[in-house]
Regions:
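Beta-strand-enriched, solvent-exposed domains that form extended recognition/catalytic surfaces
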Residues: 32-126
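Loop/turn elements at helix/coil->beta-strand transitions in domains of secreted/extracellular proteins
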Residues: 129, 158-163, 208-215, 284
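Active-site-adjacent "subsite" loops/lids of carbohydrate-active enzymes
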Residues: 125-131, 137-145, 216-283
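Aromatic-lined substrate-binding rim segments of carbohydrate-active enzymes
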Residues: 170-222
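Bacterial N-terminal signal peptides
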Residues: 1-10
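An acidic-aromatic substrate-binding cleft motif
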Residues: 116-170
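Short acidic catalytic loops
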Residues: 160-168, 274, 280-284
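Bacterial Sec-dependent N-terminal signal peptides
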Residues: 9-37
Length: 284
């Protein structure tokens, strides 16, 4: 139980004890409503963060009792307050950039504010200012639109605004499953696990509905054993010997698709090649 103490505001004397200017003035008391908590209402918002000017849609898991109120706080300041009912309502936050607010749902009982639910709101034009990272790493057939929406709703409740796709790609040097014009329905990741293109897309679509940013993981200096067939040149690699017979590599467990052979990330031709392969991903 949290109680807010009343503060007694008294006129103060100067350094010499003189109080002539306020002589005869009586002390004043600021009354503060006591507060307690009963966090029984689950709240959610429709996005992980909001650009200045965007409206926030709040949803309560169950219908709110009559007389329920919500106040919006910026640190110790209350910037808005209203009565709400039903299971959903809309709030227009102030347009100041890079501010975080607390929505505080409460009811009044015997002169006490009883907090029944809280949730934060991030108003930022650029999510990189306050990054909150999450990850997805399973792209099997069971990751349907419904399943990925449910998972991203959970991350959204934690205000995750960036989601990284870990080991989603076909090959480090050729991340897309298929080609720019013909996607594969299913392909194998580096550990020879099935990756469904539909599952990858389901995650991206669910994340974008919550305003999250999707980003894919890849190396800027790695290629697999069949890279020559995909256009990777021998002179782009890093070698362990002066005669350039043994490529440097990151060895992986047996049964995986390939070891990762190290490429010189400063090589301009390699950079151009990998940029083109990344563009294959973005156009799809």
């Amino acid at each position: 139980i949290y109680w807010v103490a009343a503060f007694l505001c008294m006129a103060c004397s100067d350094d010499h004890g003189s109080n002539q200017e306020n002589e005869g003035a009586s002390g004043s008391v600021t009354e503060v409503t006591p507060v307690t908590s009963d966090l029984s209402v689950d709240l959610s918002t429709d996005k992980a963060f909001y650009k200045p000017g965007e409206k926030v849609v709040f949803t309560a898991e169950d219908a709110l009792p009559a007389g329920t109120k919500v106040r919006y706080r910026l640190l110790g300041e209350v910037v808005g307050e209203e009565t709400v009912n039903g299971t959903s309502w809309i709030w227009q936050p102030p347009t100041t950039d890079f501010k975080g607010y607390m929505a505080e749902l409460y009811r009044q009982e015997n002169g006490t504010d009883v907090i029944v639910g809280t949730i934060a709101v991030d108003v930022s034009s650029d999510p990189a200012r306050f990054p909150r990272y999450g990850f997805v790493a399973d792209f099997s057939q069971e990751k349907t639109a419904e399943k990925t929406q449910e998972e991203m709703a959970y991350l959204n409740r934690h205000h995750i605004n960036w989601v990284q796709f870990q080991d989603w790609h076909n090959k480090h040097h050729w991340p897309l499953g298929g080609t720019r014009t013909q996607l594969d329905e299913v392909y194998m990741d580096i550990a020879n696990r099935e990756v469904y293109t539909s599952s990858v897309k389901n995650y991206i679509e669910a994340q974008h509905r919550f305003g999250m940013k999707s980003m894919f993981y890849n190396l800027c200096f790695g290629a697999l054993k069949d890279a020559a067939a995909d256009g990777v040149k021998e002179e782009w690699y890093l070698f362990k010997d002066a005669s350039h017979t043994t490529k440097d590599s990151h060895d992986l467990p047996g049964g995986w698709k390939s070891n990762i052979y190290l490429v010189d990330p400063s090589n301009k031709e390699w950079q151009k090649y990998l940029n083109e392969r990344n563009d294959d991903v973005y156009v799809n």
